[in-house]
Regions:
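Non-catalytic nucleic-acid-binding/docking modules located in mid-to-C-terminal regions
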Residues: 4-10, 55-65, 80-94, 120-124, ...
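Noncatalytic, basic helical substrate-engagement surface that gates or grips nucleic-acid strands
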Residues: 4-151, 159-178, 270, 275-278
């Protein structure tokens, strides 16, 4: 039976992955300012924020940005982290705008958006050398919101690992999908407490992290039922499980062969809670 996803009628805070939401509008909305430069990122973000507030009726809004050098910590773990990413492009035709103008325009739109948001009743968080993902992980677990319903706004699957707490939800705007831990387990066959480990096996192309060859999420779901359980499984426990199989399948052999890759990915994919106050 498919679980229902009805957000509890309690105090609510929505926590927004700001760059994720900005880029969706920036690449799609063709709006231009009087000088003939794009301003769709700024306009689209504000409109999206208005709609989120209408739909979820939050008591507070927290907007989280990547800090300067936010990826540095993970890049020290793996130099290939986020390497080779293509520049963000408009998915529509622009009228002869040079790359340097487009890059400056994107920065200008974000700075303008910061200013607009500073005049609104929202909280903005941005910390040098900390990624927005980690700030969001901190906010949803902050004691201030212990009795609140927390709704994270992002299309990023990294946040699935937070859904082990029943008070945390995720709204995926592109998919128009509202998820909690029960729904994730139903859809993916993997418990939120073990989702980061499953992703470490699968890899993440968007962050340039290679997984175990020929082992995707479907194979993981079918052959590693240990990841369905609520108890968080460590990498070492997973490898012990693979060794103990009387009849080892290819998936078990591959995991043992690529142990170090899985461990490295897992360290990067885990969300860390920075020591911040707000």
């Amino acid at each position: 039976m498919r679980p229902t996803t009805e957000v509890p009628d309690t105090k609510r805070v929505i926590i927004i992955d700001a760059l994720n939401m900005f880029l969706r509008s920036y690449t799609v909305i063709p709006s231009m300012n009087p000088q003939g430069l794009p301003n769709g990122g700024t306009i689209g973000f504000i409109k999206s924020l208005q709609k989120l507030c209408r739909d979820f009726r939050p008591h507070e809004v927290v907007i989280c940005w990547d800090g300067h050098g936010g990826s540095e910590k993970r890049r020290q773990m793996n130099k290939n982290y986020k390497a080779g990413r293509r520049p963000v492009r408009f998915n529509r035709r622009m009228i002869d705008l040079p790359d340097d103008v487009v890059k400056k325009n994107r920065t200008d739109q974000q700075l303008r958006l910061h200013e607009y948001l500073n005049s609104m009743p929202v909280i903005q968080l941005m910390i040098d050398y900390v990624e927005a993902d980690d700030i969001i992980a901190h906010v949803v677990k902050h004691k201030k919101y212990s009795d609140w319903t927390k709704i994270s706004i992002s299309s990023d699957k990294d946040f699935f690992q937070l859904l082990g707490d029943d008070s945390i939800w995720i709204w995926r705007p592109i998919q128009k999908l509202l998820l909690n831990g029960t729904m994730l387990l139903y859809n993916e066959g993997i418990h939120p407490n073990n989702y980061a480990l499953a992703r470490a096996i699968d890899g993440d192309k968007s962050d340039n992290l290679q997984g175990v060859p020929r082992i995707g999420m479907k194979t993981i779901k079918t052959n590693l039922p240990i990841l369905v359980q609520e108890n968080a499984i460590s990498c070492d426990e997973l490898f012990v499980h693979c060794r103990m199989q009387v009849k080892q399948k290819n998936v078990h052999k591959k995991l043992l062969e690529y142990q170090e890759r899985v461990k490295g990915n897992y360290k990067i994919m885990q969300l860390y809670e920075p020591n911040i106050s707000f």
